[in-house]
């Protein structure tokens, strides 16, 4: 038996004796027998992964520390959308570094997500107040993506009858790059200047622009309004604390990055972007929206609103392919605003503006030409032929400034900038700081009050803030409290040793456009990770740029698109997708300019190979791609996977391999060996980056050799087709995956996969006598997850899958994935990290729930008044003076009788009214004046 270092044993839940007991329950002599039965021989990797030997936690931290120590952290004045920040320690320790916040899942189960939903609601309120627009989503991936998404909203608003987009000012280069990538497959015409015509869907107004200048856009905005074009403001949210809200000067939408609200630069990410819109656009915006509703007893409760817009329901007709966004970072930004309050935010903004104004005045006094007259934080100076020399001199003093071209430099101030910095920077131009007025746009200063809501005025002491964040966290159920058995989500351990480096100075505080020689630690770490992921998947090249799984899908499909175009086959636009696919698949295909053709599945869940063959041959002249999830979304290793790939290749298409279920393959099989041409890998699933309550995520893609030239580029690297604002996307959290692979080694990764498959098969075995297990493969085995058919309870007792999901809360569990991929069922994925004790506790709860349903079926409890129909039960409901239910209080809150009351999770609200919440949409808190 292989001896593993302590970390491997600590990452994997079942002990050796547990593994033996679980295998015995399955009637198997060994793990090898299980893998032989579950995983088709035709795809199995018959060698060990060629990865570095596993290190202990201490040794891995030391090695990574040495690598990241090669980075040279200098004070950045580069700007261009990335700024130095002071993350309040109370937020860093109690939110950013707190597993109660970072291990939570997207808040689909609202009753156990009230804490993070509340803080996201405050984020939306913050954005609405800053922009003056009534509706904001709960974050997008980055500023560049948000601009592209806003353009998509404008085109949908015009029902795609308009396709021209006017960039009315100078946006950051990376934003233009991402917009151009998005525009090509969707047929958008990107123009610059001020000419608005009848085909213009929207104008994009930077506020301020990449030079730091507030331009005069009054005429182009008036022209846009006259022509019916929408106005999109790209606005700095710190500047908006002292500048007039964009809605006041005609913006229909506003977007930007909330990074400077307490979130470190992190060499490019992750950061939360914002998007706010006018009311008429509410139902076509992308991303999650948190709304306020009520629970079954009329108490205010938060929930995800308007989900019918999203990809998991609307598929190729969705408003976006985005699912995971940046919830953790949005919550940090909201907490930053709550901590400082409106006066504190304005003080930061005024100080930044004053430094920039004094710097501008000093340069003007020295005869240096600067761009514009109305500035906030950035001064762009003309220095003919001297840009590189001045930047080099700044570098010697430990400061980085932006080289725009050979004759132009930019200097951006932020909340970390000091008087000493101002003096040193002025000296580069042969001058000294002078007094200067804060140069805002005349008539555009913020006159009205903002953030008058009580929450932004109530937490000024650290004691209050610490307890506020604790109260919110206590409302939620995250991995630090219990198992989250969500199918297709891989909620595994996010080990402390993996998370620690994210906060290191050498990881968190580098600008993504810092000189290459100063980021050699990142270069080495990302190079390691790319090589390891290539070995794990079998591909020739990897891009780490996509900052979510959805963006990985998009990047992979765009690589396929560009490959076909380069071969003179740009007409290939048909994407075959099984009916069982994740909703992001068709949504991503549509974004990549492809038309979706659905491939049928057989009654046993497998892809209908005859239907695939017929449709591939029918569309052979135009076939671009086939998207497949493996193991299937039904949790089964399909025997015909290689044949599927051959059919597609024979008809001129490329195979896109959805890596959502890669946790069942690592060390056992490789997508490229199976026949895939491209695959995205969810580092926030298989490779231990936490879900953060709805982001961040990372979705790198691996590609075969012929697709390597078509991986995403970046304007800073002299290439194009970027899908994210930064070259390495959410770079700072890549260290989590580096640590995971380094501490597991090839053998440990394989062992984790085997344990995940064992845990899932053990659950299927324990539950199959009570609930049908819908789909199994050869030898009656599942992969790493299983579908439990709770419709038997509906048939016998009228108990719905939602009743079961909410009752599991009373048992102390987050519900499994509900009604997907099969309506009325639960899909359970335990991962390798859950111990046998917790797995048995879940199985016991599911069996007990079936027993409770039988009492309803037998008439012991009425169909409309029983513990399942009334679940979940709150403390206040249970402690009510009157108890009129036919079951006892103990049966309500300590079901099964054997559950430890000291470990009881109390949901803060009872069942939330979803329908009422959508009918009466409330997605931000009204200002105090609204109550007058």
UniProtKB/Swiss-Prot annotation:
It comes from the Bacteria. Keywords: Oxidoreductase, Pyridoxal phosphate. One of its GO terms (biological process) is glycine decarboxylation via glycine cleavage system. Its EC number is 1.4.4.2. It catalyses: N(6)-[(R)-lipoyl]-L-lysyl-[glycine-cleavage complex H protein] + glycine + H(+) = N(6)-[(R)-S(8)-aminomethyldihydrolipoyl]-L-lysyl-[glycine-cleavage complex H protein] + CO2. One of its GO terms (molecular function) is pyridoxal phosphate binding. The glycine cleavage system catalyzes the degradation of glycine. The P protein binds the alpha-amino group of glycine through its pyridoxal phosphate cofactor; CO(2) is released and the remaining methylamine moiety is then transferred to the lipoamide cofactor of the H protein. NCBIfam families: gcvP, PRK04366.1. Belongs to the GcvP family. The glycine cleavage system is composed of four proteins: P, T, L and H. This is Glycine dehydrogenase (decarboxylating). It comes from Brucella ovis (strain ATCC 25840 / 63/290 / NCTC 10512).
